[in-house]
């Protein structure tokens, strides 16, 4: 029983430490989600925690939304074979 508890705790820690992080990206344009208020940012935090993103925390860094605790399935900037195309 103790072994099972230790294994479960280790797997939890590995998942927490190795969680993905990066800039949120708009899949259709390939651009980062922009922001103006640097540091703690309610808009970035809300976007990062949205169901389709799945992050645990978001803030504004270098005028773009940076997310932590993202699942591997969430794309981050830069997208492969797609550059930011603002029109």
UniProtKB/Swiss-Prot annotation:
Organism: Centruroides sculpturatus (Arizona bark scorpion)
GO CC entries: extracellular region
MF (Gene Ontology): sodium channel inhibitor activity; toxin activity
Domain characteristics, as noted in the entry: Has the structural arrangement of an alpha-helix connected to antiparallel beta-sheets by disulfide bonds (CS-alpha/beta).
Tissue specificity: Expressed by the venom gland.
Functional description taken from the UniProt entry: Beta toxins bind voltage-independently at site-4 of sodium channels (Nav) and shift the voltage of activation toward more negative potentials thereby affecting sodium channel activation and promoting spontaneous and repetitive firing. Induces immediate paralysis in crickets after injection, with a total paralysis occurring within 15-30 minutes and lasting for 1-2 hours. Is also lethal to vertebrate (chicks) when injected in very high dosages (more that 100 mg/kg).
Localization per record: Secreted
Principal localisation: secreted
Domain LCN-type CS-alpha/beta intervals: 20-85
Keywords for this protein: Disulfide bond, Ion channel impairing toxin, Neurotoxin, Secreted, Signal, Toxin, Voltage-gated sodium channel impairing toxin
Name used for this protein in its record: Toxin CsEv2
Claim: Secreted is one of the keywords in the record: yes
SMART domains for the chain: Knot1
Signal peptide, first to last residue: 1-19
Pfam families xref list: Toxin_3
Disulphide bond pairs: 31-84, 35-60, 44-65, 48-67
Gene Ontology biological process terms from the UniProt entry: defense response
Family of this protein: Belongs to the long (4 C-C) scorpion toxin superfamily. Sodium channel inhibitor family. Beta subfamily.
């Amino acid at each position: 029983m103790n072994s099972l508890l230790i294994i479960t705790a280790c797997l939890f820690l590995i998942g927490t430490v190795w969680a993905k992080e990066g800039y949120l990206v708009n899949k259709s344009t390939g651009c980062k989600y922009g922001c103006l208020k640097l540091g703690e940012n309610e808009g970035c935090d809300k976007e990062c925690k949205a169901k389709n993103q799945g992050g645990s925390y978001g803030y504004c860094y270098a005028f773009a939304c940076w997310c932590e605790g993202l699942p591997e399935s969430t794309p981050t900037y830069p997208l492969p074979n797609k550059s930011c195309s603002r029109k």
